[in-house]
């Protein structure tokens, strides 16, 4: 494998910049203290709105100003702006992705919308790209499982998408384009907010569309970026009949088609490789927040998600499809000819239905130095996955499962002193997949050592039950053949213990020119779920077996540095280091059963770099302008190529983005705004160079930056 140029290898990661601090707002020229992240109000850590500097459990924030400056159109692109939070692509054909947190894969964190779980099992496959930025006011990230308020599997933390709550009627219209390899990726969205005069009720209507043609990076005729057409519509409504009551309704409907591979103008079964998805996703929630007295309040919420998906994973494989090419055989393209390639691919269609229901309740009682929280949560999910023919006939039921989890929690936020907060909590969860309930204690401590320095520590336990996972409903392909995942008999639950210790420092609480924080973490996972090598079964199908490994350990550290000498300049820097390893080597490749002689074992988590970092310098030369230069570093990682039977250590990547934003206020009260954002993403085109090619490619062999160099422009009118 090639390596990063010498000058980049020596670049100190401590100089990489993380966007965990908010950027300057363009509407005004505020004082630096107004921009410091400790002044931001958050609600995720304790489910009560507090200043970020006061919460006892470490929380990081990405505000809408940050998202707008970088022209991020969906959550997957916005998430990459947070230090220690990494989006990894997992398929060259369909571009499914996951969010890694604390050095752990996406299955170990929980994605929330206004505090309520957002994605079902099937929704997690492509859901990161199906959440428009227009639905989000800010993103709050709680790393580690220090709060008992969230589910048992959130051992790496929670990512909470907070929706806007407009104070006046208005809205925006926005359109943009990224030009990548000469192909435009287009997006447009509109938002309309209607707010009552006394602001006790409101309605927001949102719509967004993203669409692009398939993009081929290496000219082999097979896409690296899927052809996609995403349409999203939704509404958010709220009503506060009394000062202590708030009712909220959120609805979202998503219609997405995506297809990757080759021969995109032909039916899927006539492509050498095709991964094609047609997804209908309906999601909603209703919540009731009620203040009973000054010391007692409660919240009740119900959420649902319902997904229907028609899919195709597979293809003809290495079959000649050009009539003028040597070896062309038209019978191979006829599904009615027994034994032909088309007769096999005709049977690779599928249909999946995945409903999810979630009920959440919480009672808060403040008494003296204690803030007690009690709650019950219930999740019910079903998944049916059928294998079908090209004309819709059912061949087999691949999955037909229903599972649920009933959890109860108690948490005491105890102010031991004016400068010491202790959070004691515990959960009891009964999963339908386990015989016994699981007790998960959690504790967090915060100590304000002086006005400039705050220390935090936390210990949490959690588990993951052996349910249906993302890998079961996303099907990898190897040479046009499906690779299915199944659980071994007697698969046990994972048990996890995570610990965190860190500090936050500010140079001057009243005028913070400098800020610095650092956190060390350690996670011990028992009976870790692991995927074995790809094998061909007695039925001739390729599959991977999920089993319990002996366990794994993940240790790491993150640090962020911020400097703002004036409202015009801001520099933020951060780096993360994580070592994610199994306790014993795991066999990840073995072709001896097919007559080969290659066996590969590894202790490392695959596609998990040890070093990552982010960087941004922003400058406001004049009130209408803001410019930035940003860096994103991804260190080497271990990646398996199943086609070659090789474990590769990748190169490092240093992605550079440049951009600017101009705006002008209009109207008598300057409530209207016109803005233009433009720039270049991935200026030096840092990305994977050894992409798999042709019909026999291993779709899972993809790593590093997801997008090649692109030019972008975004136009926005707010009113």
Give residue spans per PLM region.
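Extracytoplasmic beta-strand/coil segments of soluble accessory domains associated
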Residues: 51, 76, 80-117, 137
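Conserved C-terminal beta-signal and adjacent last beta-strands/turns
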Residues: 2, 9, 16, 40, ...
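Outer-membrane beta-barrel translocator/receptor signature
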Residues: 120-122, 134-137, 148-219, 226-233, ...
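Transmembrane beta-barrel wall of Gram-negative outer-membrane proteins
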Residues: 183-211, 220-258, 276-297, 366-374, ...
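Membrane-embedded beta-barrel scaffold of Gram-negative outer-membrane proteins
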Residues: 191-192, 297-313, 448, 456, ...
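Flexible loop and strand-edge segments within Gram-negative outer membrane beta-barrel domains
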Residues: 212-215, 220, 224-230, 244-291, ...
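Short acidic/polar hinge/loop motifs at secondary-structure boundaries
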Residues: 98, 116-143
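Gram-negative outer-membrane beta-barrel transporters
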Residues: 415-419, 515, 521-524, 545-641, ...
């Amino acid at each position: 494998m090639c390596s990063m140029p010498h000058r980049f290898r020596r670049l100190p990661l401590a100089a990489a910049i993380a966007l965990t601090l908010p950027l300057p707002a363009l509407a005004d020229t505020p004082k630096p203290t107004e921009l410091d992240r400790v002044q931001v109000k958050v609600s995720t850590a304790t489910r009560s709105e507090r200043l970020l500097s006061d919460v006892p459990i470490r929380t990081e924030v990405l505000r809408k100003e940050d998202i707008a400056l970088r022209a991020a159109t969906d959550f997957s692109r916005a998430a990459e702006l947070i230090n220690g939070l990494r989006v990894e692509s997992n398929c060259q054909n369909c571009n499914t992705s996951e969010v890694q947190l604390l050095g752990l894969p996406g299955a170990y964190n929980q994605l929330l919308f206004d505090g309520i779980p957002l994605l079902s099992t099937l929704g997690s496959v492509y859901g990161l790209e199906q959440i428009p930025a227009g639905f989000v006011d800010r993103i709050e990230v709680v790393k580690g499982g220090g709060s008992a308020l969230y589910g048992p599997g959130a051992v790496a933390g929670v990512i909470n998408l907070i929706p806007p709550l407009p104070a006046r009627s208005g809205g925006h219209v926005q359109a943009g384009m990224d030009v990548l390899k000469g192909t435009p990726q287009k997006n447009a969205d509109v938002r309309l907010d209607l707010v009552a005069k006394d602001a006790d009720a409101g309605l927001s209507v949102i719509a967004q569309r993203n669409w692009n043609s398939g993009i081929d990076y290496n000219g082999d005729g097979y896409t690296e970026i899927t052809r996609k057409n995403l349409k999203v519509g939704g509404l958010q409504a709220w009503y506060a009949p009394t000062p202590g009551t708030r009712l909220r309704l959120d609805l979202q409907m998503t219609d997405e088609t995506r297809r990757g591979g080759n021969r995109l103008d032909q039916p899927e079964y006539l492509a050498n490789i095709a991964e094609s998805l047609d997804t209908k996703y309906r999601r909603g929630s209703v919540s009731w927040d009620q203040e009973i007295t000054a010391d007692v309040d409660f919240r009740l919420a119900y959420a649902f998600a319902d997904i229907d998906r028609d899919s195709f994973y597979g293809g003809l494989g290495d079959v000649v499809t050009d009539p003028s090419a040597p070896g062309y055989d038209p019978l191979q393209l006829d599904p009615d000819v027994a034994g032909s390639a088309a007769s096999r691919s005709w049977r690779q269609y599928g249909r999946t239905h995945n409903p999810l229901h979630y009920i959440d309740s919480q009672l808060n009682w403040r008494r003296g130095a204690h803030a007690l929280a009690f709650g019950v949560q219930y999740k019910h999910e079903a998944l049916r996955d059928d294998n079908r023919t090209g004309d819709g006939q059912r061949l087999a039921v691949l999955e037909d499962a229903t599972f649920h989890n009933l959890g109860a929690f108690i948490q005491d936020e105890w102010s031991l002193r004016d400068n010491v907060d202790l959070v004691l909590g515990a959960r009891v969860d009964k999963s339908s997949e386990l015989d016994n309930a699981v007790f998960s204690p959690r504790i967090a401590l915060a100590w304000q050592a002086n006005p400039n320095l705050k220390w935090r520590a936390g210990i949490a336990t959690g588990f993951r039950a052996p349910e249906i996972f993302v890998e079961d409903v996303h099907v990898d392909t190897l040479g046009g053949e499906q690779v299915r995942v199944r659980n071994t008999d007697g698969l046990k639950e994972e048990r996890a213990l995570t610990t965190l210790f860190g500090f936050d420092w500010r140079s001057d609480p009243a005028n913070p020119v400098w800020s610095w924080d650092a956190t060390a973490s350690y996670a011990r996972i028992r009976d870790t779920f692991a995927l074995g090598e790809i094998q061909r079964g007695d039925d001739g199908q390729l599959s991977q077996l999920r089993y319990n490994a002996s366990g794994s350990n993940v240790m790491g550290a993150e640090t962020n540095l911020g400097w703002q000498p004036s409202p015009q300049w801001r520099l933020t820097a951060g780096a993360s280091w994580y070592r994610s390893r199994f306790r014993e080597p795991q066999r990840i490749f073995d072709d001896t059963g097919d007559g080969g002689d290659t066996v590969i074992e590894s202790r490392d988590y695959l596609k998990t770099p040890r070093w990552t970092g982010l960087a941004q310098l922003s400058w406001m030369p004049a009130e209408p302008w803001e410019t930035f230069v940003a860096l994103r570093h991804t260190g080497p990682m271990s990646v398996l190529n199943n086609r070659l039977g090789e474990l590769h250590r990748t190169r490092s990547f240093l992605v550079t983005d440049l951009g600017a934003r101009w705006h002008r206020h209009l109207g008598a009260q300057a409530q209207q705004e016109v803005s233009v954002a433009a720039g270049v993403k991935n200026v030096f085109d840092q990305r994977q160079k050894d992409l798999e090619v042709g019909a026999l490619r291993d779709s899972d062999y993809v790593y590093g930056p997801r997008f090649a160099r692109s030019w972008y422009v975004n136009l926005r009118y707010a009113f």
